[in-house]
Amino acid sequence: MTMTEEKPTSDGKGGWGFFKIPFRNSSGHRNAASSAATSPFPSGASSSSTSSHLHNHHQHHHQHHHQHHHQLGYNGPHGDGSGQNQHPTPSPSVSSVAKSFLPTKRRLKLDPSEKLYFPYEPGKQVRSAIKIKNTSKSHVAFKFQTTAPKSCFMRPPGAILAPGETIIATVFKFVEPPENNEKPMDQRSRVKFKIMSLKVKGPMDYVPELFDEQKDDVSKEQILRVIFLDPERSNPALEKLKRQLAEADAAVEARKKPPEETGPKMIGEGLVIDEWKERRERYLAQQQGEGADSV
């Protein structure tokens, strides 16, 4: 048997064109005809199978599109959460937003208001003073905090003030000797003090645990910077510091004195005591007179 060589087609392509199977049909009729010609099943079964395949493909595409649309609805087309099906998050109220921009209302009035002045005496413990007044309509607890608790302490470290009450607190600080020809002004920002306040229900004993138990209601009143003053040079800040320290010392001495006794001495500005003394003197004089007569 003689083998003949296959001639190329007129379009210049090889003979593999006869075996080419199109992956995508150009029309529905050609798809139906090809299915009917190549399918081993009857034409009715082929149509049913094709229809079922198209239905499943359409259902899968619809589910995928619905799932994708749901994701877009939750995250938004740009992933920014702007979709229609996104659950609305509770937006803050206008009052809360406005309150966040308002400055915190002060409960205490401080004098000095922003700085603590100390005489600069290296190697010694020096003092400063600050006047604290409760300007609110309720009882307020306050306490000191410092960035250098080892070298600074306050007296009192905290207290509870009634409405309108004023106290002068004394602040003690050890002044470190200068290093490398350091100037006093170079130390003004190293140590800071912070005064915290807390509204309380009424008069009570001060305990530091109040600020831990009600930390959500604690307010920061002021952060005070340390300023050193030359004790050899007179200036208004130094003179004011001396006056406040004298007031603080007088208040401490007044608290040390025992309370006056409440008794007969308080009745009639001492009339009871004076009458008792007169009676005793008359009694002693009478006893002396009787003794002289007996002799």
UniProtKB/Swiss-Prot annotation:
Gene Ontology CC annotation, any one: endoplasmic reticulum membrane
Superkingdom of origin: Eukaryota
Stretches the record annotates as Disordered: 1-99, 249-270
InterPro entries from the UniProt entry: Ig-like_fold, MSP_dom, PapD-like_sf, VAP
Span of domain MSP: 107-229
Biased composition (Basic and acidic residues): 1-10, 249-263
Listed Basic residues bias regions: 54-71
Composition bias type Polar residues, residue spans: 83-98
Compositionally skewed regions (Low complexity) per UniProt: 31-53
Keyword Translocase: no
Record's keyword terms, sorted: Phosphoprotein
Keyword Phosphoprotein in record: yes
Modified residues (Phosphoserine): 294
UniProt record similarity statement: Belongs to the VAMP-associated protein (VAP) (TC 9.B.17) family.
Function: May play a role in vesicle trafficking.
Official protein name in the record: Vesicle-associated protein 4-2
Species assigned in the record: Arabidopsis thaliana (Mouse-ear cress)
Lineage start: Eukaryota, Viridiplantae, Streptophyta, Embryophyta, Tracheophyta
